[in-house]
Amino acid sequence: MHGLFSSVVFFLSASLAASHLPVFPPATTASSPYELASVTEKSYGVYGELGQTDIVWLEMQGVKGEDMTVSLQRSEKRAVYDVAIWGKGLDNVTCGNKNWYGWAHSVGGHYFTRNLTELPAAVRDAIGSSEAFVLHGDGVESPEFEPFGVGLYWPLGGCKDTFPATATYRMALVNPKEELAAYSLGVGMVESFSFTDLLLMPFVIYRTFVWSGRSAEAVIGIFALSVLIFYAFRLMTLQRNSYAAVGNQSLLTVSLHVLWVCAGAFFASGVSFLFQLILCFTVKPDLGTIVLVPLFVHILLPIIFAFLIFFLYQPYGRWWIKLGAIAAGAYMLFFGWMAFLIFPVLSILVVLLHWVR
């Protein structure tokens, strides 16, 4: 048991240590940019789509001497985009003095320029007389596997240096081409997640699946079909003692069905990530040993939890089985992201109901 717990802690730590917080900014303007808070203490993955006339405005607070890292990536669809950065002291930033390129690359071509003439007029006006430079996201590199959200990204360019001052820095993402760009901008390198970040992760992870090129219908369809198959199979294998244990208490009977549906959602979460992993494998067959992290955290454990509830749980069963079911629900609440929050919460409430009855 201690070995299993240690394995869970190890894989969870590995998952979070190789990750950044995904965010999808709403519509922004030069006067109302999207703020990336505490970028020296927290890393972000900024996702979205960028048309030829679109501009995404971002803002971050720099701390003098702390790492300043910006990394440009895209989805599988071939595209380019540029990132203008301006603020105090940027004339002293060279972006590439360590030959750093993206999250995982170390090559000399860092695609850095101080020529602002190709930027849209609105961006040049916003920059004014501020010190600035532009990162060109037009690199051609092999895809990298991201185990946290189970996806692939294609590095395009980047900047690694230190903030020259404690000040506000602005960024503008622009698209110099006609093709729509599905961008992923990494900002910061410190992995940090709040309680709320983990609770709301299912909804941004779902959006990253769609961002990667899958349709929303396919993502939801696989989840719903997996839940239906699991629940239908449970109904087909009902044992009489499942109902003998609850007698004529309709509330407990209904709650037991709710728990089976929740277990189906745990199973569906594992299947959803498995399908996503297979798609990654078809593009990049060598995902490296880091693939063990999503296999364990996002696929194996949720499916195991689902079948443990399937085979072992009874409303009036032993207390340690109920405690295990609550622990499984808590795990899925924070790490079973394709169980969409509501199903882990419901599973915990159902088990607590059975415990007090």
Please tell me what each predicted stretch does.
Residues 128-164:
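Beta-sandwich interaction modules
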Residues 224-262:
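Juxtamembrane interface at the cytosolic side of transmembrane helices
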Residues 79-81, 146-147, 152-153, 169, ...:
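Edge beta-strands of jelly-roll/beta-sandwich modules across compartments, strongly enriched
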Residues 312-343:
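Membrane-helix boundary connector in multi-pass membrane proteins
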Residues 50-134, 164-166, 173-178:
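Acidic, Ser/Thr/Pro-rich low-complexity intrinsically disordered segments
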Residues 17-56, 127, 132-138, 194-212:
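Non-catalytic extracellular/lumenal accessory regions of secreted precursors
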Residues 214-221, 289-302, 337-340:
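Alpha-helical transmembrane segments of polytopic membrane proteins
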